[in-house]
């Protein structure tokens, strides 16, 4: 059955979920298939985190962090994340940067400083946005909202493989502990906690391939009467 839900002129598909659930890869492939723009909101937070480390801004100083974010020069070009005109795509994936990103994301002023930048990614013909609150806070009128989940063991294995491929060292036990701690922080923070939107479609990717996950998202989009 086709949905009768009203559509924004520029459709958005949101893909939310915890760290290492596969949402970034799935979002990128869905966007490429549809010819849509892509927003990796996690990269924005990691860029802010990297800047806070470089400029020695304390992770608990919410006002200073928000001011830092306001002045950052952030761009995405040809799949690369740039900070002050320099490609830092690999650097922002380091474990220490990820930990800092999760730590500063608990501050409402920091999140508010990044909201406008995230919403500005909505351009024709459409947008696929991945993150933790894309469907609940940033794009509540998205035409399709997906919430990806996976067991913490599956997610740790994925993150370990990803880090090793990038040339970073990683310990599986440490990754498991880190993911559990991040899940607790992200789910319990006062500002936009990690949770599925009421109208989000849940997708457990623990036993699915990337291709199967992508096809499920596209199938849901087709059910809305949209070409995919």
UniProtKB/Swiss-Prot annotation:
Chief location bin: cytoplasm
Q: Which GO terms describe its biological process?
A: nucleobase-containing small molecule interconversion; pyrimidine nucleotide metabolic process
Q: An example Gene Ontology cellular component term from the record?
A: cytosol
Q: Which Pfam families match?
A: Cytidylate_kin (PF02224)
Keywords recorded for this protein, A-Z: ATP-binding, Cytoplasm, Kinase, Nucleotide-binding, Transferase
Q: Report the InterPro entries cross-referenced here.
A: Cytidylate_kin, Cytidylate_kinase_dom, P-loop_NTPase
Q: Which domain of life is it from?
A: Bacteria
Q: Which reaction does it catalyse?
A: CMP + ATP = CDP + ADP; dCMP + ATP = dCDP + ADP
Q: Where in the cell is it found?
A: Cytoplasm
Q: Which EC number(s) does the record attach to this protein?
A: 2.7.4.25
> What molecular functions are annotated in GO for this chain?
ATP binding; CMP kinase activity; dCMP kinase activity
Chain sites annotated for binding ATP = 17-25
Family, per the entry?
Answer: Belongs to the cytidylate kinase family. Type 1 subfamily.
Q: Which NCBIfam families match?
A: cmk
Descriptive protein name: Cytidylate kinase
Q: Which organism is it from?
A: Burkholderia thailandensis (strain ATCC 700388 / DSM 13276 / CCUG 48851 / CIP 106301 / E264)
């Amino acid at each position: 059955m086709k949905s009768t839900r009203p559509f924004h002129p520029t459709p958005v598909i949101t893909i939310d979920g915890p760290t290492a659930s596969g949402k970034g890869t799935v979002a990128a492939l869905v966007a490429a298939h549809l010819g849509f723009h892509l927003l990796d909101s996690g990269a924005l937070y990691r860029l802010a985190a990297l800047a806070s480390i470089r400029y020695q801004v304390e992770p608990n100083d919410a006002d200073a962090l928000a001011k830092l974010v306001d002045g950052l020069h952030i761009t995405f070009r040809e799949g690369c994340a740039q900070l002050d005109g320099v490609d830092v795509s690999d650097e922002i994936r380091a474990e220490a940067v990820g930990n800092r990103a999760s730590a500063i994301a608990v501050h409402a002023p920091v999140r508010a400083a990044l909201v406008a930048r995230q919403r500005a990614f909505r351009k024709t013909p459409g947008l696929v946005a991945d993150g933790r609150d894309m469907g609940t806070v940033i794009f509540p009128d998205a035409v399709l909202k997906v919430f990806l989940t996976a067991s913490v063991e599956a997610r740790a294995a994925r993150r370990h493989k990803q880090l090793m491929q990038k040339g970073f060292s990683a310990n599986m036990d440490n990754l498991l502990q880190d993911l559990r701690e991040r899940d607790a922080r992200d789910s319990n923070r006062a500002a936009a906690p990690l949770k599925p939107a009421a109208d989000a479609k849940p997708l457990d990717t623990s036993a699915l391939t990337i291709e199967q996950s992508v096809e499920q998202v596209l199938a849901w989009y087709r059910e809305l009467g949209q070409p995919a």
